Regions:
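Transmembrane-helix boundary/entry motifs in multi-pass membrane transporters
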Residues: 3-12, 41-47, 70-100, 117-123, ...
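Extracellular loop-to-transmembrane helix junctions
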Residues: 8-11, 38-63, 240-250
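Hydrophobic, membrane-embedded alpha-helices of multi-pass small-molecule transporters
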Residues: 10-30, 49, 96-100, 104, ...
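Small-residue-rich segments of transmembrane alpha-helices in multi-pass membrane proteins
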Residues: 19, 49-50, 82-93, 153-168, ...
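Juxtamembrane transmembrane-helix boundary signature
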Residues: 20, 51-77, 259-262
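Juxtamembrane interface elements at the cytosolic ends of transmembrane helices
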Residues: 26-36, 60-73, 133, 137, ...
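Membrane-interface loop-to-helix entry segments
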Residues: 111-115, 122-129, 137-171
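Membrane-interface interhelical connector segments
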Residues: 184-195, 256-287
């Protein structure tokens, strides 16, 4: 297959970086719940988790893209057979398909809950909206898909980065107090035995887990992009997207640490135990932001749901 977009283009690089960003982030990232469990819960060691994610995520995506560019797979899922052989590769193909399909319906549930919680809409309306938007985008083909989510993803990351920067500029002096609270388990409003949720027993397992579940999502997606784009455009896009996501994670994580015991408006929950911890950060920036933030979360779900199909 002849590659499209062969000439180097910064515009194309930005779109591809946006696609990487968009696929990696989702409702868990936008709400801040993923960042709490995979990074913030480990305090300063969360930076080591981030280093593990950055290295592994960058490594396998560059190699998936390289394989797609050089092998020109008839089907993107053939990348599993390329790496794992006929039998194991076929198993991985079916497993990843089922995994992505089930992940899509998790996204549908998240979209329905988001619009229901913020705007009081019936659950089925949020579900139908996401399914319809996803179907329309997927029907447009790979290039339309990449262009669509490649524009939305960076907007979400920029907003998250802005929340992180504003919060740290205002509350940076509270980071040490937050680190002490995490280390000593002194969380406001915690019941006996209750503590902050984490994704694994230590920062290493957390980092491998965070990059590992994304591997099943990205393998065929990167292989497909590799057949349609020049290596240089795609490599730069992968690097740029990975850096942008990592910067956003670091900023939001330390913003959460500085506000780990900050309560919501009625004091019933705090950043450490909130379902949507970033909403508390956003409301501290500007109270009416919660209504806008629900749209941001929905957009994050959309950008992750589209490539799953």
């Amino acid at each position: 297959m002849k590659q499209e977009h062969n000439a180097f283009s910064w515009k194309r690089v930005l779109i591809l970086a946006g696609a990487v960003i968009a696929f990696q982030i989702g409702s868990g990232f936008a709400t801040g719940q993923e960042i709490i469990q995979y990074y913030t819960a480990y305090g300063v060691e969360g930076l080591l988790t981030l280093a593990v994610f950055f290295g592994t995520f960058l490594y396998y995506n560059v190699n998936f893209a390289k394989a797609g560019a050089e092998e020109h797979f008839e089907k993107a899922n053939d990348i599993y057979r390329f790496y794992c052989g006929k039998y194991v590769g076929t198993f991985c193909d079916y497993y990843s398909t089922i995994f992505c399909y089930m992940s899509f319906w998790v996204m549908v549930g998240g979209a329905a809950s988001t619009l229901n919680q913020e705007y009081g809409l019936p659950l089925w309306i949020g579900a139908v909206i996401l399914v319809a938007l996803t179907a329309i985008t997927v029907a447009g083909g790979l290039e339309f898909l990449v262009d669509a989510i490649g524009l939305v993803g960076p907007i979400i990351v920029v907003i998250c980065i802005a929340i992180g920067i504003i919060t740290l500029f205002r509350d940076g002096g509270d980071i040490q107090a937050g680190l002490d609270a995490i280390k000593n388990g002194t969380f406001e409003g915690a019941k006996a035995g209750e503590t902050i949720k984490n994704a694994g027993p230590n920062w290493l397992i957390s980092g491998l887990s965070y990059s590992g579940f994304a591997l099943l999502w990205f393998a065929s997606f990167m292989a497909a992009l590799g057949t349609k784009n020049s290596k240089k455009n795609l490599y730069y896009g992968i690097i740029g997207g990975t850096i942008a996501v990592s910067v956003a994670i670091a900023l939001i994580s330390f913003a959460q640490i500085a506000n780990i015991n900050t309560p919501n408006a009625d004091g019933s929950i705090h950043v450490w135990d909130a379902a949507i911890p970033n909403l508390i950060l956003a409301m501290k920036v500007w109270k009416p932001f919660s209504a806008i933030f629900a749209v941001i979360v929905f957009a994050g779900i959309y950008t992750s749901a589209v490539p799953l199909l």
